[in-house]
């Protein structure tokens, strides 16, 4: 049956090379046309399942709030009055940008400052009363001329005030968004878009930068603005500025990934080209291989345009990867064809034998490799599912092209350039002489025993491999925006990006606020900011008033003339706060209330509740736990869904971790099924799967020893290594089945296997030049896995075949 199929394919190629070449040229031309219309969708929100409650809530929040996310401009300098003037000027200009919904550098906090005492916990208020009495006694002794060394009371009072100087994420001692050290002023921008829409983020950042540059040229305040993030304020009149927030961080990572892929693809192409020159040393053969490869990539991206319509931030990296992976089929074809032609001198028969034997191996290899990728199509995360579809289809397309266009090109060249076939002849005398001796593979038992011990040892470490929950290991790295974000969190006491819950009525908002105030149940919540956090319960306020009355009685004992500097400012704030009477929401200024209400154009009348998480936004383990607690909140039988950047990223993390456990296992099962169908002999699986299993175990074991971890980006490599590991074993094993000579299989196929592996490694290793942590981790994982599979294929697998042949056990059938 195989003979008939191989003969039929060979006849078609041999008799109609011109027609087939024309058809391929038309397909490539149409694919190039489609590829020219291919775009990259940078909206990462669309990669997450759109049916998730958090995604639906995000889309609704976009309508209610007119967008979500923030862009922060941090102004840094020594001249605080000048900084405030510059902040006011820039804020006014930024508000004119069409993409900007609001921009603020200050807010009237007089109400919060005057009622500060009512936002203090009762226990802390009692502690303040105790410290105040102690302070009065100390000051009385000083007034009488007695020495007092009570500095601890002053420090404790300052710490207590510092704890409550930030009410509802607003500092009450200054209307400007200025940090306690008075070195940084923040301009907070809310835009009419989402950070995941990278085209929108790019436009927003560009417009804001243009406003700052134009303002700097006019220089109305005599300030010198320059973009630089660093430690400490700038000297003299210079004000440095930096941008951060969800818009900036998301865009920087995507832009740097995009820029990183260009040199990586170039390095992959040049690296593969150089290696092919070393491997074949014949310019025309290299041109044929590279031309076929490039045409295959064009067809693949044309297929992508037709089926998916666009690339995303994950699939945009496939060009270089497919180059390294796909060239393998061409290398195996050329090696086998040259082998056959050098011995037979007949193009037709050489082509038929190549298709019959290497073509079968390539078919099984392409089927298993693509199957291991096609399983990703079932993934909920579109970054993975699209990657699986494009990469799986790309492998099949390249394999088909290598066994159609390459033969056709050789036949046409032979027709119009008869001397071309002379370049295909190789002197195989030394190999032929070695074949006649038919020596066994040396040291098979020792290699098998040593590799078995090594594999067992590495398997132990492989089981201890961990998942890296730090999302920064999957992005560009510590960019200026990320470092500035960290600094802002520390200086302004903001531990993470807030998530938002929308409620339709004031009653629902109150119940939600009370529910989230349960600190034991919501242990990953640092703070809940609601319209009701602006007006504490009246019962609590009345208790507070009683304590304040006691404090007021004692406050008159403090000599005001002894208060200076910070103590005087603190004294004035406390004194005014003590005089304030209990209040309700009706007394709170509208400027403070409107931040909790939808934009007027939404037509909705509900309220927002902000949930501020503990920990860093980059610690995905904490964001996952936070999301498990607040992602869905049930109050009186009704579900409320939180949304925000952290919630979306946590959902992505959970999907990736779940898919990462399921799909490698599915790929393994699918590979087993394909091999059983192909060989119809379970014994063959022992040999064919040796490189796969060995490569995976060695890869994971070495990763642990090098202290590397699985992360959100490199996890997609696991199915790739599975497919490639089985591919390596198939070519060697099928050659072994032809002769049942281990050394014959290695001599005639080993070089092609090694060459194909090296080109693939070059493709993945090109990611080392990306400067992107996520891409570099992908390259590292793939290089480890493929190199491990190659080492197993050239040492352990031959030893296993030789050992079983000597012992006459597990001997498979002679034909696949």
Residue map of PLM features:
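Signature of alpha-helical transmembrane segments and their immediate interfacial
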Residues: 1-42, 407-412, 416-470, 816
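Alpha-helical transmembrane helix bundles of large polytopic membrane transport and channel proteins
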Residues: 23, 85-185, 204, 224-230, ...
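Solvent-exposed, non-transmembrane loop/terminal regulatory segments of multi-pass membrane proteins
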Residues: 35-78, 163-176, 437, 443, ...
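Extracytoplasmic
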Residues: 150-283, 571-671
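Interfacial segments of transmembrane alpha-helices in multi-pass membrane proteins
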Residues: 259-311, 379-382, 663-707, 769
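Pore- and gate-forming transmembrane helices of large, multi-pass membrane proteins
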Residues: 261, 290, 342-379, 689, ...
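Transmembrane alpha-helices and their membrane-interface boundaries in multi-pass membrane transporters
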Residues: 306, 323-335, 359-378, 383-426, ...
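Juxtamembrane segments of multi-pass membrane proteins
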Residues: 436, 443-563
């Amino acid at each position: 049956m195989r003979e008939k199929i191989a003969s039929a394919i060979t006849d078609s190629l041999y008799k109609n090379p011109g027609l087939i070449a024309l058809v391929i040229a038309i397909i490539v031309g149409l694919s190039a046309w489609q590829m020219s219309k291919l775009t990259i969708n940078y909206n990462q929100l669309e990669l997450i399942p759109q049916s998730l409650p958090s995604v639906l809530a995000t889309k609704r929040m976009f309508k209610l709030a007119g967008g979500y996310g923030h862009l922060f401009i941090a102004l840094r300098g020594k001249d605080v009055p000048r900084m405030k003037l510059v902040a006011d000027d820039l804020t006014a200009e930024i508000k004119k940008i069409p993409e900007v919904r609001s921009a603020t550098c200050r807010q009237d906090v007089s109400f919060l400052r005057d009622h500060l005492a009512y936002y203090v916990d009762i226990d802390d208020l009692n502690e303040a009363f105790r410290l105040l009495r102690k302070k009065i006694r100390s000051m009385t002794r000083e007034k009488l001329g007695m020495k007092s060394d009570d500095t601890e009371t002053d420090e404790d009072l300052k710490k207590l005030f510092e704890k409550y100087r930030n009410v509802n994420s607003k500092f009450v001692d200054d209307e400007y968004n200025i940090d306690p050290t008075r070195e940084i002023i923040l301009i907070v921008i809310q835009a009419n878009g989402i950070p995941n829409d990278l085209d929108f983020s790019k436009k927003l950042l560009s417009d804001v930068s243009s406003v700052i540059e134009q303002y700097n040229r006019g220089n109305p305040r005599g300030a010198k603005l320059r973009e630089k993030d660093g430690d400490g304020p700038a000297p003299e009149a210079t004000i440095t500025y930096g941008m951060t927030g969800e818009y900036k961080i998301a865009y920087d990572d995507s832009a740097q990934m995009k820029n990183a892929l260009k040199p990586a693809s170039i390095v992959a192409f040049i690296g593969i080209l150089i290696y092919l020159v070393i491997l074949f040393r014949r310019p025309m053969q290299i041109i044929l291989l590279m031309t076929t490869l490039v045409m295959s990539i064009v067809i693949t991206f044309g297929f992508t345009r037709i089926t998916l319509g666009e690339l995303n931030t994950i699939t945009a990296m496939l060009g270089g990867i497919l180059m390294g992976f796909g060239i393998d089929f061409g290398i195996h074809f050329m090696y086998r064809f040259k082998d056959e032609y050098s011995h037979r001198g007949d193009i037709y028969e050489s082509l038929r034998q190549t298709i019959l034997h290497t073509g079968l191996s390539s078919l099984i290899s392409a089927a298993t490799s693509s199957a291991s990728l096609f399983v990703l199509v079932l993934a909920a995360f579109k970054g993975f599912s699209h990657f699986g579809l494009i990469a799986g289809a790309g492998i099949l397309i390249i394999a088909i092209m290598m066994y159609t266009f390459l033969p056709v090109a050789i036949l046409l060249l032979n027709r119009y350039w008869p001397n071309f076939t002379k370049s295909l002849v190789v002197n195989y005398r030394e190999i032929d002489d070695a074949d006649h001796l038919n020596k066994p593979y040396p040291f098979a038992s020792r290699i098998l025993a040593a590799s078995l011990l090594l594999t067992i040892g590495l398997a132990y470490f492989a089981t201890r491999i961990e998942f890296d929950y730090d999302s920064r290991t999957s992005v560009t790295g510590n960019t200026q925006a990320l470092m500035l974000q960290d600094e802002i969190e520390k200086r302004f006491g903001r531990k993470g990006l807030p998530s938002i819950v929308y409620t339709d009525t004031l009653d629902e908002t109150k119940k939600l606020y009370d529910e989230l105030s349960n600190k034991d149940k919501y242990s990953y919540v640092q703070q809940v900011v609601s319209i009701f956090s602006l007006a504490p319960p009246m019962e609590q306020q009345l208790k507070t008033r009683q304590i304040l009355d006691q404090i007021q009685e004692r406050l008159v004992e403090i000599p005001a003339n002894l208060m200076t500097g910070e103590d005087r400012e603190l004294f004035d704030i406390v004194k005014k706060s003590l005089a304030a009477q209990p209040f309700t929401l009706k007394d709170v200024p509208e400027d403070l209330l409107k931040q909790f209400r939808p934009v007027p154009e939404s037509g909705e009348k509900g309220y927002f509740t902000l949930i501020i998480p503990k920990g860093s936004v980059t610690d995905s383990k904490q964001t996952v736990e936070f999301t498990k607690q607040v992602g869905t909140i049930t109050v009186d039988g009704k579900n409320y869904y939180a949304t925000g950047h952290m919630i979306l990223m946590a959902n992505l993390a959970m999907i990736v971790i779940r898919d990462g456990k399921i799909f490698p296992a599915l790929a393994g099962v699918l590979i087993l099924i394909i091999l059983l169908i192909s060989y119809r002999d379970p014994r063959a699986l022992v040999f064919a799967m040796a490189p796969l299993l060995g490569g995976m175990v060695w890869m994971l074991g070495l990763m642990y020893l090098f202290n590397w971890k699985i992360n959100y980006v490199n996890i997609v490599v696991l199915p790739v290594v599975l497919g490639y590991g089985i591919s390596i074993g198939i070519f060697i094993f099928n050659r072994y089945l032809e002769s049942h000579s281990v050394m014959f299989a290695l001599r005639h196929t080993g070089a092609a296997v090694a060459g194909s592996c090296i080109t693939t490694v070059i493709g993945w290793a090109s990611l080392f030049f990306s400067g992107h942590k996520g891409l570099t981790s992908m390259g590292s994982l793939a290089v480890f896995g493929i190199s491990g599979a190659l080492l197993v294929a050239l040492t352990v697998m031959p030893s296993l075949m030789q050992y079983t042949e000597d012992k006459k056990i597990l001997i498979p059938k002679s034909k696949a």
